[in-house]
Swiss-Prot record:
The keyword Transport applies. The lineage of its organism: Bacteria, Pseudomonadati, Pseudomonadota, Gammaproteobacteria, Enterobacterales. It comes from the Bacteria. It catalyses: ATP + H2O + (2R,4S)-2-methyl-2,3,3,4-tetrahydroxytetrahydrofuran-[AI-2-binding protein]Side 1 = ADP + phosphate + (2R,4S)-2-methyl-2,3,3,4-tetrahydroxytetrahydrofuranSide 2 + [AI-2-binding protein]Side 1. ATP binds at residues 44-51. SUPFAM superfamilies: P-loop containing nucleoside triphosphate hydrolases (SSF52540). It is a peripheral membrane protein. Keywords: ATP-binding, Cell inner membrane, Cell membrane, Membrane, Nucleotide-binding, Repeat, Translocase, Transport. This is Autoinducer 2 import ATP-binding protein LsrA. Its main location: membrane. The gene is lsrA.
Length: 511
């Protein structure tokens, strides 16, 4: 946080910034200021305009009108190269690394020779507590480590204006604290940080000022100490929302296809002593109509387990039983045909085709079954059904998925999975980077799916989310199920955290 009064000359002033897409005003005269040595948090619902504003500041997208004042000079528009030269660096929510290059090559990519300091990079790695093998491929990193590499790229460029878009979305509490410690050191040097997040406790911990965007405008702005949580939430979501899906939404959400019907509580998916990359000896049972939470720290093996269940990774031992039949040797497509559907944690690189239309994305899994690029007259109608059910905001079915906000992209991905008519739905971090309003929609959606006797496996690093949603909870620690299933009052953040850190005598998982 800001520790001095050396803020007379702001690092950045955005004045009267306007932006329009396809006739829709997404920014309506935005004013935004960032001072030296401060963290200015930016909040807002999905589609509020946060990402568009930051892309304009970073030179990725031009504004239609308005100016950016940086270092006492005014600019109508910037390019990414010019923004970097001015000390502006945007760390995106979805890390954009070269998977086939080493970690070292990714960090140093595009740097001027004078900045190619191995010692500087090693010092930054040590300060952040990162224990990377710099010669390993970036593609081998999990989401949390890819986020750290992106932050390192910005720090290596001596950035004076650092824009962090959901930087802690995939970080553990310990990793978050390490990051905040490093940010405090940067602030002391006069760096200014724009911090985009949906996590209010973190914002109160790190931010000097808060601005809330709504519908392309600044709805609220002030010092963190002077704004109450109620003020902030009201500014983000001014319209009172229903706590559950409406009757019409539930009607639109009736799952398609001829799925085998199981009574609630019937075992649907059983894992017997499963061993694979990142996990070992995992045994559990998932029942029809329940939401089974799978908690654990980043690196505990949860995503590796999910990808193995879907056939994306090789199984080394044990059995996967779906409806009483072993599916170990089945391909991903064959598992999909039998009703096993997986929603990956990284929607942009693994879940959606960002350049394809919304209608195509929603029907992508059924396209695979009919012929990859097959099209039907029903695709637009299918998209419309999910728009009504999930409250997805878009202009036309043909627009590309990349044009949507993060929350609406996530809803398109969920619709894609539901259209495959799942018996078992594995959802990995379903609300990562999603605002309060859209998060509530997704929670009610998952409950509605489970009410149709779909078996839901919920993988989440948000322990409050696990506590809120799960009927039973397994916790993974260092690749193993660390305890028998938690139920009832034992499903609470404190107990889950204790088990996740291994501070509990391990018991054999009881199914």
């Amino acid at each position: 946080m800001q520790t001095s009064d050396t803020r007379a000359l702001p690092l950045l002033c955005a004045r009267s910034v306007y932006k329009q897409y396809s006739g829709v005003n997404v920014l309506k005269g935005i004013d935004f200021t960032l001072h030296q040595g401060e963290v200015h948090a930016l909040l807002g619902g999905n589609g509020a305009g946060k990402s568009t504003l930051m892309k304009i500041i970073a030179g990725i997208t031009p504004a239609d009108s308005g100016t950016l004042e940086i270092g006492g000079n005014n600019y109508a528009r910037l390019t990414p190269v010019h923004a970097h030269q001015l000390g502006i660096y945007l760390v995106p929510q979805e890390p954009l690394l070269f998977s086939s290059l080493s970690i070292k090559e990714n960090i140093l990519f595009g740097l001027a020779k004078k900045q190619l300091s191995m010692q500087k990079m090693k010092n930054l790695l040590a300060a952040l507590g990162c224990q990377f093998d710099l010669h390993s491929l970036a593609g081998s990193l999990d989401v949390a480590d890819r986020q750290m590499v992106e932050i390192l790229r910005g720090l290596m460029r001596d950035s004076r204006i650092l824009i962090l878009d959901e930087p802690t979305a995939s970080l553990t509490p310990a990793e978050t604290e390490r990051l905040f410690t490093r940010l405090q050191e940067l602030l002391a040097t006069g760096v200014g940080i724009v911090f985009i997040s949906h996590k209010l406790p973190e914002i109160r911990q790190i931010a000097d000022r808060i601005s809330v965007m709504r519908d392309g405008t600044i709805a609220l702005s002030g010092k963190t100490s002077e704004l109450s949580t109620d003020d902030i939430i009201q500014a983000i979501t001014p319209v009172v929302r229903e706590k559950s899906l409406s009757a019409s939404q539930k009607l639109w959400l009736e799952l398609p296809g001829n799925r085998p019907q199981h009574a609630a509580g019937t075992p649907v998916l059983t894992l017997e002593n499963l061993t694979g990359e990142g996990f070992r000896n995992v045994s559990l049972t998932l029942n029809a109509g329940e939401i089974l939470g799978l908690a654990g720290l980043v690196g505990a093996g949860r995503t590796e387990l999910a990808e193995t269940l879907y056939g994306l990774r090789t199984l080394r031992g044990g059995r996967i039983m779906l409806n009483g039949n072993e599916i170990n040797k089945l391909s991903t497509g064959e598992r999909l045909l039998r009703g096993l559907v997986y929603l990956p944690e990284d929607r942009q690189s693994s879940g959606l085709n960002l350049d394809a239309s919304l209608a195509w994305n929603v029907c992508a899994l059924t396209h695979n079954l009919r012929g990859f690029w097959a099209k039907t007259a029903k695709d637009n109608a299918t998209l419309e059904r999910y728009r009504r059910a999930l409250n997805i905001k878009f202009n036309q079915p043909e627009q590309a998925a990349r044009t949507l906000s993060g929350g609406n992209q996530q809803k398109i991905l969920i619709a894609k999975c539901l259209e495959a008519s799942p018996q078992v739905l594995i959802v990995d971090e379903p609300t990562r980077g999603v605002d309060v309003s859209a998060r509530n929609d997704i929670y009610q959606l998952l409950r509605s799916i489970a009410a149709q006797n779909v078996a839901v496996l919920l993988i989440s690093s948000d322990l409050e989310e696990i506590e809120l949603m799960a009927d039973r909870v397994y916790v993974m620690h260092q690749g193993e199920i660390a305890h028998s299933a938690l139920t009832g009052r034992d499903i609470n953040v404190e107990t889950i955290m204790r088990v996740a850190f291994g501070d509990s005598q391990r018991q054999e998982a009881s199914c």
